[in-house]
């Protein structure tokens, strides 16, 4: 009964697949026959020789019968109609003719047999090559994710039923995860595959169908690298170092340094596109000349006319300090350390006036999804605004690397709690935090272990059994340690493991405060503070742009600030599922991924606004996470470049203010009049950091975060606006500048006061009154 059901299912599936999906693929319908023939070939060439012998034997018998019939006809009619008998000479001639013919048949038989052998060899080799090709295909896609989506058409092939049947057959060979809200499928083959399975070969044929798009999963990352200042060695350290530990992040905002643009206090912007500036804040704490006052004028046209270059600038020039190395600089209010810099007084986009105007109109909650490195969900300034949190890290490996110790998992620190007393006397119990009993390890033949420090265990990878180990406390000195005193190689491995794990425990203890949160990098937490920081500490905490923003956090990037396209697609699906109105996507790649474009198109159909950073660039070739080319017209970056074909993407560059008051593009910001819409402040912003810390940083990611917060602000005032209407309000509120005219599509930067005013005007009359 089971075989019959399987047979019926098999015929049904094959007919549908062959007739509907695989008109371009040969041999699928008769695949079973092809397999059977191949198996016959593999059994040996003898079977085919037997077939040849039978064939030519029948030919020979037919020839013999022809001869006999000819001999029987002794009489024949000549041309004149006379009857004449054949004599013996005629018989001899016929025999000779038959012998010649028989010899010719044998020669032809030998020739054909040789040709058949060659043909069989070719068929056999072709079969072997096909097997090797299938194995190679399987090896290439095994343990990898494939991104699948159906090509859009209006035929019956796009119906749910046929898609369901298609994916059901594929599911028999591997695991399928359906992303319902963006119409994608993530496909993975199992770790162990039977290469001889006919169904597997059919699945490979399925993946070659012209009805679907199949894309390999690829890695994508941010374009920035965070740094912190280390007071111990007076140099800049990468935050995402080998030990993934973050140092010199302040507990309180008042402990953060004031950033003054002088060559002696911080590095040029173009040197590091994404740098945390941690300096002594007391240097300018009492210097009132460093306080930049807000220009409250809304008449930008008058300001433009006062400038010979027709460029927008602030009139108060005396409050700036020139940056001697770059001839341009960012400014930071040095006295009030509240919130982001656009709230503190460095207010070139009139954020403070706009927020004051919007205060009584923000009535609607807005779901904002952040696809990034995660968030510190316990941060006091953020925890009340987080409504959803999800991690998609299918490719991440939980390893903890410390200077050559590569195989210690962060979730498993067992193995150093107990060392058997039979192997090493006097070292019965070793606690994880305290190793008593091995105070001094001396050796005559072990390099690098005279002094063992917790921060350096290089050089003790191998401890040989022939080495003599003397201990001043628990292992007595002797020339040869015999029996129970003898330390074997396995015991030495235990000692090595013990020392290695002790160092790991110390490093883990140092970093434990930073590993408790879901954001081990800090980038996602920093962005969340700009958008929706809502500190209960008042001026001592971070106040973000949109108080009504409800954060949906999706972690698609690991602690090294990198992730995979499939993880990002899962986050897109998660954001759509949770009904997000806005998605902040601060990542970029030089590679065009059709699946990423298709997913953004699905979000466009769902009226979801996507805010993307333009990307950071640097002329420094050593900066691996910054692009060498700043002009996106020359080197496209995605997803920013998709804005030319999609109308739900806003791409943002970073602006700074020169000492003369002019607003210009930051030298480390990517730009394009075709793919980047506008610019926003993103330099020296103070925001939240994991474990209730605060930090200062710069980059286009934070410019995009400012626009994300403003989009949330607009929707909190008028939730009935569509994404296109929000974009039109942004375009209407742009301050045109000559310096940005050929840098961004809209030719300027946003004015928040005008944006809020236009949004309030868009409200229905009854609500406005």
Swiss-Prot record:
Pfam families xref list: Peptidase_S8
Region span, Disordered: 293-329, 468-493
Superkingdom field: Eukaryota
Protein name as it appears in the record: Subtilisin-like protease 3
Function: Serine protease which may cleave PFN/profilin.
Biological process annotations from GO: protein processing; proteolysis
Annotated compartments: Secreted
Similarity comment: family membership: Belongs to the peptidase S8 family.
Transmembrane segments: none
Reactions catalysed, as given in the entry: Hydrolysis of proteins with broad specificity for peptide bonds, and a preference for a large uncharged residue in P1. Hydrolyzes peptide amides
Gene of this entry: SUB3
Active site annotation, chain numbering: 372 (charge relay system), 523 (charge relay system), 701 (charge relay system)
GO function terms (MF aspect): serine-type endopeptidase activity
Entry's Gene Ontology cellular component terms: extracellular space
Keyword rRNA-binding among UniProt keywords: no
Low complexity bias: start-end ranges: 303-325
Residue intervals of the Peptidase S8 domain: 345-756
Compositional bias annotation for Basic residues: 293-302
Listed InterPro entries: Peptidase_S8/S53_dom, Peptidase_S8/S53_dom_sf, Peptidase_S8/S53_subtilisin, Peptidase_S8_Asp-AS, Peptidase_S8_His-AS, Peptidase_S8_subtilisin-rel
Listed EC numbers: 3.4.21.62
Glycosylation sites: 68, 102, 108, 295, 316, 356, 482, 515, 584, 616, 720
């Amino acid at each position: 009964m089971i075989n019959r059901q399987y047979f019926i299912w098999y015929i049904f599936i094959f007919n549908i697949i062959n007739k509907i999906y695989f008109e371009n693929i040969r041999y699928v319908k008769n695949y079973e026959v092809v397999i059977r023939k191949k198996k016959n070939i593999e059994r040996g060439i003898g079977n085919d020789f037997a077939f040849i012998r039978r064939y030519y034997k029948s030919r020979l018998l037919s020839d013999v019968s022809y001869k006999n019939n000819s001999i029987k006809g002794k009489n024949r009619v000549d041309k004149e109609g006379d009857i004449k008998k054949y004599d013996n000479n005629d018989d001899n001639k016929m025999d000779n003719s038959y012998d010649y013919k028989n010899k010719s048949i044998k020669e032809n038989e030998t020739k054909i047999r040789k040709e058949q052998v060659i043909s069989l060899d070719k068929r056999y080799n072709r079969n072997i090559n096909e097997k090797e090709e299938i194995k190679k295909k399987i090896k290439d896609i095994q343990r990898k994710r494939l991104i699948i989506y159906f090509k859009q058409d209006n035929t019956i092939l796009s119906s749910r039923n046929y898609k369901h049947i298609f994916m059901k057959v594929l599911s028999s060979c591997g695991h399928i995860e359906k992303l319902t809200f963006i119409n994608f499928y993530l496909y993975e083959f199992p770790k162990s595959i039977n290469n001889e399975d006919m169904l597997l070969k059919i699945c490979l044929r399925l993946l070659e169908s012209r009805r679907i798009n199949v894309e390999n999963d690829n890695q994508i990352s941010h374009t920035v690298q965070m740094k912190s200042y280390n007071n111990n060695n007076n140099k800049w350290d990468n935050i995402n170092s080998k030990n993934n530990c973050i140092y010199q992040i302040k507990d309180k905002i008042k402990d953060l340094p004031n950033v003054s643009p002088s060559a002696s206090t911080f590095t040029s912007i173009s040197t590091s596109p994404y740098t945390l500036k941690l300096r002594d804040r007391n240097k300018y704490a009492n210097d009132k000349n460093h306080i930049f006052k807000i220009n409250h004028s809304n008449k930008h046209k008058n300001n433009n006319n006062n400038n010979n270059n027709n460029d927008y600038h602030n009139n108060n020039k005396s409050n700036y300090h020139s940056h001697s190395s770059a001839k341009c600089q960012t400014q930071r209010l040095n006295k009030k350390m509240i919130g982001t810099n656009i709230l503190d007084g460095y207010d070139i986009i009139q954020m403070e006036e706009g927020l004051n105007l919007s205060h009584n109109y923000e009535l609607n909650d807005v779901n904002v999804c952040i696809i990034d490195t995660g968030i510190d969900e316990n941060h006091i300034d953020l925890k009340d605004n987080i409504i959803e949190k999800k991690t998609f890290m299918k490719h991440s490996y939980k390893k903890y690397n410390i200077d050559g110790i590569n195989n210690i998992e962060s979730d498993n620190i067992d193995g150093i709690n107990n060392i058997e007393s039979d192997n090493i006397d006097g070292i019965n119990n070793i606690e994880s935090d305290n190793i008593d009993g091995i105070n001094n390890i001396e050796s005559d033949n072990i390099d690098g272990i005279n002094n063992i420090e917790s921060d350096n265990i290089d050089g003790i990878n191998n401890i040989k059994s022939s080495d003599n180990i003397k201990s001043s406390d628990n292992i007595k000195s002797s020339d040869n340690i015999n029996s129970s005193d003898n330390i074997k190689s396995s015991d030495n491995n235990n000692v090595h493991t013990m020392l290695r794990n002790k160092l790991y425990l110390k490093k883990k203890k140092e970093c434990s405060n930073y590993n408790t949160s879901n954001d081990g990098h800090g980038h996602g937490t920093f962005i969340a503070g700009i958008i929706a920081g809502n500190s209960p500490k008042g001026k001592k905490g971070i106040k973000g742009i949109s108080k009504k923003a409800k954060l949906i956090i999706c972690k698609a990037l690991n602690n090294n600030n990198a992730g995979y396209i499939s993880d990002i697609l899962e986050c897109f699906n998660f954001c759509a599922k949770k009904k997000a109105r806005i998605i902040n996507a601060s990542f970029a790649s030089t590679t065009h991924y059709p699946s990423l474009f298709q997913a953004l198109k699905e979000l466009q159909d769902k009226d979801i606004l996507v805010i993307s950073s333009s990307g950071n660039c640097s002329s420094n070739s050593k900066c691996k996470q910054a692009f060498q080319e700043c002009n996106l017209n020359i080197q496209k970056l995605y997803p920013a470049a998709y804005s030319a074909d999609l109308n739900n993407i806003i791409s943002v560059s970073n602006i700074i203010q020169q000492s003369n008051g002019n607003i210009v593009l930051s030298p480390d910001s990517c730009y394009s009049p075709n793919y980047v819409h506008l610019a926003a402040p993103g330099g020296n912003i103070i925001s939240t950091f994991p474990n209730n810390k605060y930090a200062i940083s710069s980059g286009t990611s934070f410019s995009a975060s400012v626009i994300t917060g403003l989009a949330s602000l607009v929707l909190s005032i008028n939730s009935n606006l569509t994404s296109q209407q929000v974009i039109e309000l942004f375009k209407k509120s742009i301050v045109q500048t000559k310096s940005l005219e050929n840098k961004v599509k809209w030719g300027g930067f946003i004015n928040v006061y005008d944006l809020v005013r236009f949004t309030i005007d868009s409200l229905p009359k009854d609500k406005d009154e």
